[in-house]
Amino acid sequence: MKRTIIMMLDSFGIGEAHDAHAFGDVGSNTFGNIAKACAEGKANDGREGPLKLPNLARLGLGHASKESTGEFPAGFGDDVEIIGAYGHADELSSGKDTPSGHWEMAGVPVLYEWGYFGDKQNSFPKELTDKILARAGLSGFLGNCHSSGTIILEELGEEHMRTGKPIFYTSADSVFQIACHEESFGLEKLYELCIIAREELADYNIGRVIARPFVGTGPSDFARTGNRRDYAVEPPAPTVLDKLKAAGGEVVSVGKIADIYAHCGITKKVKATGLEELFDATLEQVKQAGDNTIVFTNFVDFDSHFGHRRDVAGYARSLEYFDSRLPEILALLDEDDFLLLTADHGCDPTWPGSDHTRERVPVLAYGAGLEPGSLGLRNSFADMGQSIASYHKLEPMEYGESFVRS
């Protein structure tokens, strides 16, 4: 029985990419800088001491990081029994965004430039926003700037509730984000507005429109909910998910995976939010999974709650929680199963600003007949997609080199 379980630790980079200089990210290292802060006692909120990830270390995380950066992260070393194959991967895609990282690891790198809204203020063309407002029957909007999602709620959430005007904002990524209150504005109305925006953005080459619903009564208790939706453009070519589906296999999306791939190549969608719920749902889907199945989970909290918010202790705390539950996954695997843990980009919580960082990502592989040891530097995330194709005996992807024997 052949089953692939992909656990995407969203934003968990392991050191600057070869082209980090082009992004202003030289020195970024999500894993390494978190470990350093923990070792120095600078991440003791809700946890304390050095970063403890014994199960990820056994899968080769520390060793992959050493190969990426030249040194072990603080608290990690050679004194561990390695049970998995480990490597580190550079990104071929032009951007350091979520769709690019996900599509590339599924065999389809993004070799063109996304469109971006580069101006920090007055970010959106008036022609665009006028069309969106006219179609939605709205009198105006708030925001029109680059911002963190939490900060913009503090600044504009009350005015939004008072006026009914949606909040439009963006970031360094190729995104158009819309924040609205679930009750005063309405969740379905927000989704409808996002669909309109997605259609009007067709000529701007923007990767995603993101619905950012929130609840609360004021800045002190405004909170984004788990009802986020991403409206992505479709990948430019069939991914390994599409190929497995076309071959009669099953592809199970847990969390926001389906949205990231614009629902292409997905046969089943499982909604889950929060680290615990996502892990629980992954376990349940692995238990149910039959032959020729991919179970694919994005653990978004690492990125959205801790990376972008530059919360080092929160990121460390969640990594330790994730690590503590890994044995539950390992216990469900058959000899022929293929477990793959990776990331889509970096988001170093010690880095200036609030944007992603251009980093290498871990490639931690277990099962599928792989011997424990180094996979070395992978020149593209697409090596993972090629390996999945090889494992499931699908026709080869155009990009990537497999590290799994078919």
From Swiss-Prot:
Gene3D superfamilies: Alkaline Phosphatase, subunit A (3.40.720.10), Phosphopentomutase (3.30.70.1250). Its main location: cytoplasm. One of its GO terms (molecular function) is magnesium ion binding. It is found in: Cytoplasm. Binds 2 manganese ions. The keyword Metal-binding applies. Mn(2+) 1 binds at residues 10, 344-345. Keywords: Cytoplasm, Isomerase, Manganese, Metal-binding. Its cofactor is Mn(2+). GO terms for cellular component: cytosol. Pathway: Carbohydrate degradation; 2-deoxy-D-ribose 1-phosphate degradation; D-glyceraldehyde 3-phosphate and acetaldehyde from 2-deoxy-alpha-D-ribose 1-phosphate: step 1/2. Mn(2+) 2 binds at residues 303, 308, 356. GO terms for biological process: 2-deoxyribose 1-phosphate catabolic process; 5-phosphoribose 1-diphosphate biosynthetic process; metabolic compound salvage; nucleotide metabolic process. It holds the Pfam family Metalloenzyme. The keyword DNA-binding does not apply. Its EC number is 5.4.2.7. Belongs to the phosphopentomutase family. Isomerase that catalyzes the conversion of deoxy-ribose 1-phosphate (dRib-1-P) and ribose 1-phosphate (Rib-1-P) to deoxy-ribose 5-phosphate (dRib-5-P) and ribose 5-phosphate (Rib-5-P), respectively. This is Phosphopentomutase.
